[in-house]
Regions:
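C-terminal scaffold of the Radical SAM
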Residues: 1-8, 14-255
């Protein structure tokens, strides 16, 4: 697909960020991801030291998997924790991490990569106190970035979400209190808020961009470069952004 689309792209435009996500790409073997990274590097002109990020499902990855992935060319890992509370994870049918979070962080730090942690609030069995406990544990692990996403309950779009209604979901007011509790903990730990849901350490490039008036946002989220308003997406359901226009790939893998 990359080779098919390449003739239509601006060959003078340098690529500054590469992101594997919109799902859980770590179901692919590390060797295949390494080969794909190499093909992207050979195909596009990259800036010096571009960001190469990948979203990871810790419920599927062993220590060896983390180590192999860290040597596959990635320099930023987004770990989809969602919650440290086992009851919450079981209710939403989310596999708990195979390794203790401390082990994962130790492995990645030894490989010299940057670490993001993603959390969801508004899930069944979550309370203000339980989510605060999760965020406090996250802070103790000292990730470079921490993101608190609000769970969007849209069963008409994703019918499998309907089953969560049997357990019950937190109200809007309860979700607001969860977020405010998390925000308070993060700010007291000297994490800096970026927009609505990102919190970063003071040495993070997003915070530097915010201070310098160079923070931007594209379809993927916050970024430090205006040029990332151009997003070339590949793969099933991938969404490209070309200036103010968007285009989405088919959701049918056979198509």
């Amino acid at each position: 697909e990359i080779d098919l689309i390449l003739p239509l792209l601006d060959k003078k435009r340098k690529v500054s960020q590469i992101h594997y996500g919109g799902g859980t790409p770590t179901f692919l073997p590390a060797l295949e991801l390494k080969e794909l990274n190499a093909h992207v590097s050979d195909t596009f002109e990259l800036i010096e030291n571009p960001e190469k990020a990948i979203e990871c499902h810790p419920g599927w990855m062993t220590g060896q998997d983390w180590e192999k992935l860290a040597t596959a060319g990635f320099n930023r890992f987004s770990i989809g924790i969602q919650d440290f509370n086992k009851q919450v994870l079981q209710t939403v049918h989310r596999q708990a991490p195979l390794l203790q979070p401390e082990e994962i962080v130790t492995i990645l730090r030894s490989c010299g990569v940057r670490i993001n942690m993603d959390f969801l609030y508004g899930l069944p069995h979550q309370t203000e106190a339980s989510f605060a406990e999760t965020i406090e544990k996250a802070v103790s692990l000292k990730p470079d970035r921490l993101v608190t996403f609000s769970y969007a309950h849209v069963p008409w779009a994703f019918p499998r979400q309907k089953v969560l209604e049997k357990t019950g979901l937190p109200s809007g007011d309860e979700k607001s209190r969860m977020f405010e509790a998390a925000r308070k903990i993060l700010c007291e730990a000297d994490y800096q808020p970026i927009g609505l849901d990102h919190f970063v350490r003071k040495d993070d490039e997003l915070y530097t961009a915010l201070l310098n008036g160079q923070l931007h946002r594209n379809f993927q989220g916050y970024c430090t470069r205006r040029t990332t308003g151009q997003v070339y997406a590949f793969g099933v359901t991938g969404i490209s952004q070309l200036g103010t226009a968007y285009a989405q790939n088919t959701k049918d893998i056979m198509e």
